């Protein structure tokens, strides 16, 4: 039993004495690792920024493009919103304010003459 204790004590002392390094070495190693991590984070941040700028440019380009659906639509039937100042919108119909009040009370709609 004593040999086991002595062996354990010897292994413990060796592990503690050999395992402890210089504080300066540990500090330098930690600084190197953090600097590498910072450079990696800077690289990742720049890459993400480039991708976001490309995406933003693409979205702005899509918004500014004219499509055939972006032009003003004409009234094609009764009950469709219209502009009171543009009589062409309601061809064959009259652009009037609704008689019933509701959430649409400020807008005009096409009605039959």
Swiss-Prot record:
Membership in a protein family: Belongs to the neurotoxin 14 (magi-1) family. 01 (HNTX-16) subfamily.
One Pfam family name is Toxin_22
- Give the protein's recorded name: U11-theraphotoxin-Hhn1i
Q: Which InterPro entries match?
A: Toxin_22
Its subcellular locations are: Secreted
Q: Which cysteines form disulfides?
A: 75-90, 82-95
Tell me which GO cellular component terms the UniProt record holds.
Answer: extracellular region
What is the annotated role of this protein in its UniProt record?
A: Probable ion channel inhibitor.
